[in-house]
Amino acid sequence: MTNSEKIVYSIFGVTNKSTQDMAYAVDRMAELLFDQNQKLDGIKVGKAIYPVVGERAERPVGGVSRNIQRLTRVCWDAENRKNLIPFLGRDMPIRVPKELLFHLAYYSRTGIPYIKAMKHHAAPPV
């Protein structure tokens, strides 16, 4: 099991394929940020993440996109929200999937929330 799967499952539980889509998307975001050194502003989830996840999951890109968007909204349900805070470092609004993927990808690679790393000046710029 990958770090991203552990993170996603601890937030949402092991429910269905849509959680696997999110785990794949977290892996892809981490790959773009850490392995390919891309800037967050330059990453377009519709072009750089969803198609790769769709190919890996052997599912249509539109379905993958909807699943990830839905799970981003589901994060703010009371039960899931409390499970999300350890990975974000604090309670904060996440409006779009790209933000959530960034925070989860950062945690999956470093083991600490981005916000806490920034407070301690330990976070590398992304």
Regions found by a protein language model. Give the residues of each.
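Basic, alpha-helical nucleic-acid-binding regions used in initiation and control of genome expression
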Residues: 3-126
